Amino acid sequence: MGKLKKKGQSGQAKNYITRTQAVKKLQLSLPDFRKLCIWKGIYPREPRSRKKVSKSATASTTFYYTKDIQYLLHEPLLQKFRDQKVLEKKISRALGRGDVGDAARLERNAARPDKTGKPRYTLNHVIRERYPTFIDALRDLDDCLSMLFLFANLPSTTAVPAKMIARCERLCLEFEHYLITSHSLRKSFLSIKGIYYQASIQGEDILWLVPYKFNQRVVGDVDFRIMGTFVEFYMTLLGFVNYRLYTAVGLKYPPKFDQLKDDQGAELGAFALEGVNIATNDDTKAITNGEAEHGPDPKVQAEVDKIVQQLRVESDDKASEEGPADDVEGEEKPSDAIDKFEPVAPGGDVLPQPSYSSSDPAQLFSRLTFFLSRETPRQSLEFILRAFGCKRIGWDSVLGEGSFTTDESDPSITHQIVDRPVVQAAMNEEGDGEDNQTSQKVGPNHRYPGRLYVQPQWVWDSVNDEELKSPELYGPGAALPPHLSPFVKPTQGQYDPTIPLEEQQSEGEAIDAELEDANEEAGEESDVENDMDVASDEDEEEEDEEEFDGVSVSEEEEGSEDEEESATLQRQRELEAEISGKSVKGDKKMDAKTKAKLEAKKALERKKKSEAEDLERAKGMLSKKKRKLFEQMQYTNNKKSAEDLKLRQKRRRLEKEKKA
């Protein structure tokens, strides 16, 4: 006979452990336990039955796997936390004795990050454990980038120290430099929350959110201690990723950083990239102002030129001794033309012909020179323009260092990005000097010849469509086209604002819209006729008043009686039509086109009714399970169709208002 199992020794009671028990087992404080769980990727678990795990468990009790807590017992960071706890006790005892000097000495020896910048511990081994391969780290980079870009834009407080913000900003700028060098950026989208970016790195799509450069207001209901724990982990992760990405393209990491330029607002221009590919590949050279900072050594260059000249002289002598090249038969001259694959026999396979790629999306802005006005978002525009090949970007000196030029009148500028309304400076014709201060200059409307002026959305739409959009649609003060998300794939039958309304509306919608337009036109015509009748009646009344002194009371009573009789007759016709099911016969004959549209609408309704009846009969042949599934699918499709119908109706109304 087997032994009886004791209660709480197996099953769910042994597989789960409460948070209080875990903290006691690890001999940690609750904040340190939270840090350790965040860094190691251990999350609370919900058991199937709380009563079986613990009878004293309440709704707020947090459970963990016992194996996860057992795994934390071997973590090297535990000893670091315990040493820190012992040190804090020593400092508190020294302060209790009144020995301030001893407490200060202990604090200096602790090498705290907020005092000396030296970390008490590192998370390198945690990164290696959680991400065995580099692809695993790239897949978890979305939240990392979003969090670090958020903290890079926060103001410094007691909960968010300035050193943490500076470290986040530097890591983010290093990552942006890699995207610029490797042309890995693919799409971007302007939203209410911020700017979304999508990059493709080693086959992995990475999507992150960057907030706008506004003054952030830090509220008190956000726990920045927990967020700071995530940021500390993500900073280590992005440092590893940046090192791997830089070395993969032959760049030195970390890149050279100019603190003086960064203090002057250079941001991307404060970094100078160095590496193997910088000297040979023009696409990956260090760009701060559009050109490399370090040139070749003049002595070495002179020796190289001398050797090249000697080789040229020797090759010319050999060519003169051998004779002219025209005497050689069958010599083929080199050509840049692409070979054509032609079928040898008639009826052979037709092979696809090779062709030069006329447009490279990664070099979309490579031939253009931009100037950014002061009201435009300089940081995001500079990054996205450089990521797509632009090397010459200028802006006003008040926006910071690192520009290609600060002269707005530079003739090499091809595009200027503006985001201000067109100012109409109205001059006073009478010559009064009241508004002379506001209208004495036309600087905001000044335009340089040979330059295109566009709004910032032109850059994002061109990047998402992989082609330069027409600048006429994005001119200053123009009503911009809809800015659609490039991350949403259009589905068949769904509303698409880029397609004309006539191509995506149903037949019934088109007929209803035409009938509505016809009714509106008929109503306008009747209003005009009524106005004309009223005007003619008023003229006749005026003439009668001129001829006669007044109108008799009997004539007024006769007119009112006629109106009452006509109204009663009209009501009688409506009641008879309602009883018989026929339409009310109007005074005017119906237009032939309107009548044809009404007939088409009735035929369409009959067709829909017959299709619905056929569908109901087909549903009766299904099983109960399949019928429920089919009805659920119908409900979802009808809901989407109703939403699309509302959008099309709204668009139709807006188009009518524009035409009016």
From Swiss-Prot:
Q: Which GO terms describe its molecular function?
A: ribonucleoprotein complex binding; RNA binding
List the GO cellular component terms: nucleoplasm; PeBoW complex; preribosome, large subunit precursor
**Which parts of the chain are coiled coil?**
501-659
Q: Which ranges are annotated Acidic residues under compositional bias?
A: 504-566
Family assignment? Answer: Belongs to the pescadillo family.
Question: What are its GO biological-process terms?
Answer: maturation of 5.8S rRNA from tricistronic rRNA transcript (SSU-rRNA, 5.8S rRNA, LSU-rRNA); maturation of LSU-rRNA from tricistronic rRNA transcript (SSU-rRNA, 5.8S rRNA, LSU-rRNA)
CDD domains, sorted:
BRCT_pescadillo_like (cd17709)
InterPro entries for this protein: BRCT_dom (IPR001357), BRCT_dom_sf (IPR036420), PES (IPR010613)
Q: Where in the cell is it found?
A: Nucleus, Nucleolus; Nucleus, Nucleoplasm
Family annotation (PROSITE patterns): BRCT
Q: Where is the BRCT domain?
A: 360-476
Q: Where is this region: Disordered?
A: 313-358, 471-660
Pfam families documented for this protein:
Pescadillo_N
HAMAP family annotated for this entry?
Answer: Pescadillo
**Quaternary assembly:** Component of the NOP7 complex, composed of ERB1, NOP7 and YTM1. The complex is held together by ERB1, which interacts with NOP7 via its N-terminal domain and with YTM1 via a high-affinity interaction between the seven-bladed beta-propeller domains of the 2 proteins. The NOP7 complex associates with the 66S pre-ribosome.
Q: What does this protein do?
A: Component of the NOP7 complex, which is required for maturation of the 25S and 5.8S ribosomal RNAs and formation of the 60S ribosome.
Give the organism, scientific name.
Chaetomium globosum (strain ATCC 6205 / CBS 148.51 / DSM 1962 / NBRC 6347 / NRRL 1970)
- Coding gene? NOP7
Primary location recorded for the protein, binned into one broad class = nucleus
Q: What is this protein called?
A: Pescadillo homolog
